[in-house]
Amino acid sequence: ITAGVTADPRYTRMTVVLYCSDEMILEQIKKQLAKLVDVRDIKELKPDESVRRELMLVKIRVNENERRNVIAISDVFRGRIVDVGQESLIVELTGNQSKLEGFLNLVQGYEILELARTGVTGLSRGVHDVRYLD
């Protein structure tokens, strides 16, 4: 679950990721969410009709020699080094879940000091959107 501001300050957008192959269960979940008083709208973001991303920050312990290797791995994944300490780096990565997991697999030989992930958020492709009208 992720939540954040929208173009309309009256609303907060929440993204709930469900892995469900049973359409009846998915419809039941949507109906239950729609009953909540503060729910304005529910939109299903199908993988082929949406863009989804997740943000991850990873603090990795590195010595002088390891630093170059971790930076090179980060570059391959289009990560950004957002902090450099004497014995650590913080890497920022944005992408789909498999990209972030791929990065973590490659740096598993290093000591990960801290890890923070936002969870998935997304928008539908094209001009269709959720309008914030009363």
Give names to the regions the model predicted:
Residues 1-134:
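A conserved regulatory-domain signal marking ACT and ACT-like small-molecule sensing domains
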